[in-house]
């Protein structure tokens, strides 16, 4: 095995391509659990081998605990892939409650974002995850997204987090490839890209997969990209990365990603209602057309 694909020695316990799944809403704003099951099944049919529910793309700041629990149960009923539940907050006690209840509902792991807005110290970040670890009986995926949280998890903090029993993986949305190399090598944690545009670069430094918004539109070529990389067919992987670049640009460039993910499902004919809870607003006609053009340019829908 060449050095370029040594990352295969790392397990991918939660899958390779994991859509950060939207939460379908009815026109009145209620969660549409039946449609959630439809979307989950479609994403798995597309090539996803894991799903993340109740994340930011799933409008988690506006959904309530009972809805989060029911969403985990609904999705678990219809798919045979790992289902990870977002359980993050800037309130440690609330995070612990979410972890406990979504685990009880059947989540295979929890995705816990670094506490946001309050900008805690590195010691505070560690203590937050330590408290979550003490209440967890399933794996914890650390979510590092400084563009949203206002704080970056330091290398030394990662080293200490890796010593916690249930911390097993990282969703890295820092955009810092060089930093990810050191963090991954010095912690031994399983690494996932949290940035669609950096999917292939993250694979090249040892990530096992991606937690993705664009997988609502492109799970199949994203899975093929990972498989090509595994075979050492870098030219094929590069070609696939280039192919999906237009839809990545479309879904990243003109609106909140959850909005654009719902637009993509509408364009694909999977889901008609794109209602969102305030303060987010569903996609407008222009955003839908931008996504449609991106899907066409990537060869994901007919011209």
Curated annotation (Swiss-Prot):
GO terms for cellular component: cytosol. The active site is at 143 (proton donor/acceptor), 171 (schiff-base intermediate with substrate). Pfam families: DHDPS. It is an enzyme of class 4 (lyase). InterPro entries: Aldolase_TIM, DapA, DapA-like, Schiff_base-form_aldolases_AS, Schiff_base-form_aldolases_CS. Its EC number is 4.3.3.7. The keyword Amino-acid biosynthesis applies. It is found in: Cytoplasm. PROSITE patterns: DHDPS_1, DHDPS_2. GO terms for biological process: diaminopimelate biosynthetic process; lysine biosynthetic process via diaminopimelate. Pyruvate binds at residues 57, 211. Pathway: Amino-acid biosynthesis; L-lysine biosynthesis via DAP pathway; (S)-tetrahydrodipicolinate from L-aspartate: step 3/4. Keywords: Amino-acid biosynthesis, Cytoplasm, Diaminopimelate biosynthesis, Lyase, Lysine biosynthesis, Schiff base. Coiled coil: none annotated. GO terms for molecular function: 4-hydroxy-tetrahydrodipicolinate synthase activity. The record marks 56, 117 as: Part of a proton relay during catalysis. It catalyses: L-aspartate 4-semialdehyde + pyruvate = (2S,4S)-4-hydroxy-2,3,4,5-tetrahydrodipicolinate + H2O + H(+). Homotetramer; dimer of dimers. Belongs to the DapA family. PANTHER family: 4-HYDROXY-2-OXOGLUTARATE ALDOLASE, MITOCHONDRIAL (PTHR12128:SF66), DIHYDRODIPICOLINATE SYNTHASE (PTHR12128). Catalyzes the condensation of (S)-aspartate-beta-semialdehyde [(S)-ASA] and pyruvate to 4-hydroxy-tetrahydrodipicolinate (HTPA). This is 4-hydroxy-tetrahydrodipicolinate synthase. It comes from Bifidobacterium animalis subsp. lactis (strain AD011). The lineage of its organism: Bacteria, Bacillati, Actinomycetota, Actinomycetes, Bifidobacteriales.
């Amino acid at each position: 095995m060449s050095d370029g694909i040594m990352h295969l020695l790392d397990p991918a316990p939660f899958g390779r391509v994991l859509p950060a799944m939207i939460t379908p809403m009815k026109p009145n704003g209620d969660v549409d659990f039946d449609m959630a099951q439809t979307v989950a099944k479609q994403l798995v049919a597309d090539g996803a081998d894991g799903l993340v529910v109740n994340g930011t793309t799933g409008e988690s700041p506006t959904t309530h605990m009972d809805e989060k629990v029911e969403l985990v149960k609904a999705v678990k009923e219809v798919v045979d892939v790992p289902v990870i539940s977002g359980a993050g907050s800037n309130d440690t006690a609330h995070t612990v409650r979410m972890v406990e209840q979504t685990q009880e509902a059947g989540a295979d792991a929890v995705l816990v974002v670094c506490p946001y807005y309050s900008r805690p110290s590195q010691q505070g970040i560690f203590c937050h995850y330590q408290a979550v670890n003490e209440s967890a009986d399933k794996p914890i995926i650390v979510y590092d997204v400084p563009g949203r949280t206002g704080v970056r998890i330091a290398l030394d903090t990662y080293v200490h987090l890796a010593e916690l029993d249930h911390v097993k993986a990282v969703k890295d949305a820092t955009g810092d490839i060089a930093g990810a190399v050191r963090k991954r090598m010095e912690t031994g944690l399983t690494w996932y890209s949290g940035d669609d545009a950096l999917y292939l670069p993250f694979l090249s430094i040892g990530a096992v997969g991606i937690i993705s918004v664009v997988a609502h539109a492109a799970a199949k070529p994203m899975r093929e990209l990972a498989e090509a990389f595994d075979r050492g067919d870098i030219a094929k992987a590069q070609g696939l990365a280039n192919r999906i670049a237009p839809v990545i640009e479309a879904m990243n460039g003109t609106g909140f990603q959850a909005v654009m993910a719902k637009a993509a499902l509408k364009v694909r004919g999977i889901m008609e209602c794109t209602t969102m809870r305030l303060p987010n607003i569903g996609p407008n006609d222009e955003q839908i057309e931008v996504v449609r053009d991106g899907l066409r340019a990537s060869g994901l829908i007919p011209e």
